[in-house]
């Protein structure tokens, strides 16, 4: 069997293994931020909204605070929704996985081109690159990104960065700046795509300008840096301009981009420790969590900070030292890739989530590349020994298979954990016991099963760490209602609004509860407020239809009752129902029928006045209110309506 056939067999085998390992993830559901970006996002339900995806960041999410400018993510979500004919996660996962395979394919060529620059097209390079791609593709930590649907922003933006590099490595695409197109698409997917610019500078400096500390003259160093900067300049101009436009023009003022409750220094310092967490998960991914519970560390002399700082400094020194050797320069490039890719989330811009295991999808590309250079360097230095000893090749193949097998097993298990809300959030409570949100979400799974007492235990546990979290109070309200405690339920909904007035969810859920209590007017006010904050909130729109429908049914019942046994009180009740539903002419007619039965009814004249005010018939409204006050001199509501009418009459003169 010749080498090409053997290599093809390995490629097919690796692809089949990847499909097998991820075979149990395609029906995993929508979780966490998927709710406001996909499930409740009205914008993605019509592909005709495509243009607005690129001009209006509010189409990204139904929550104003989360409306980042990521038009490519919204476009992909809309396309998958259209293909599925609804909210079927299978189609979303198929799309994400397809692009994952494309990314892995491009990574092979990217790695191969870089390694060939350092190792002169050595025959070991393709096999080592295939192993590296397999290692990355099957890595357990990457399952956090592939399973979490809205994290397609991480995976697709990483694909775009790799694609930009592959095009840059080719003569014709580079000549015509075609490599800038995937960079632009990457930035439109997630702002981390702009990190292509500093990575490109390092790539040109190390691999094309052959930068080395061995060069004695400072002028030589400076010349190489300037040349690399010139080569990177087109990407810098486009990338920086696009980033500024996206961030300061297209991103709404309602979007919360950073956490102002912590200092920039404390956040940055804490990231040194977080980096050790990311590194440990790269080597041994045993502490993966869908929602980690890390908190900001404020003491510089905390052992975790000092250990993290030591690790970061050592990695930087290793990277710089590797620049001395042409064959190990790629090792340093890989380490610096890791840090550069982490900059958007691990620098001086504090995020509310101190750490997230799906953030490492992009940085891990660099670590895998760094490993590749070490493996290639060691293998080529021992090439004669490998060829002479007949046991070495099968041993190496077996070792590679064992490594891939172990990470594959871990990935398969993580897919299982992501298979349901209950397994996912239970895992969070075990891995991140101090995360109140994890306990709350696990409580939701218990509430869904009717295990209300267990749900209450989970919610109370959550309140120990997140007592002012609006979603906790929303869910506590839902639970109290299910347990037959309407007064406590309403208190919880009101608390949620007090803690998070700009969140449409607090109004939506309160409105939903009010609808169940047949308090239609209050329900409509709350759902209207939810839609003011989030016009694309699909659940709020559906709820509004229900409220109006049930309100209309109430009107029908009142109409029948008034016709069967007419009375002034019944017509007054009917007029109020008409008024609450914006049927002002009908409200006036009902009041007139009430006056036919009882001509001295001040409430009827007041309701006529209110309706005429709504119709902006100020003169007639004034007369009706004066009649109401004539019949009942202390009628304050009528006085208020009269003042409104008279004020408008004065304005009109």
Segments the model singles out, each with a brief description of its role:
Residues 1-484, 488, 494, 498-499, ...:
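Polytopic membrane enzymes that build or remodel cell-surface glycoconjugates and lipids
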Residues 418, 452, 486, 520, ...:
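TPR-repeat structural position
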Residues 425, 459, 493, 527, ...:
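Hydrophobic/aromatic packing residues within the alpha-helices of TPR/SEL1-like helical repeat arrays
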Residues 431, 465, 499, 533, ...:
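Structural marker of alpha-solenoid helical repeat scaffolds
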Residues 437-447, 471-481, 505-513, 539-546, ...:
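Conserved alpha-helical positions within TPR/SEL1-like repeat arrays
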Residues 455, 489, 523, 554-557, ...:
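Single-residue signature of alpha-solenoid repeat helices
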Residues 541-569, 626, 630-653:
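Terminal, low-structured helical/coil segments at or just beyond the last alpha-helical repeat
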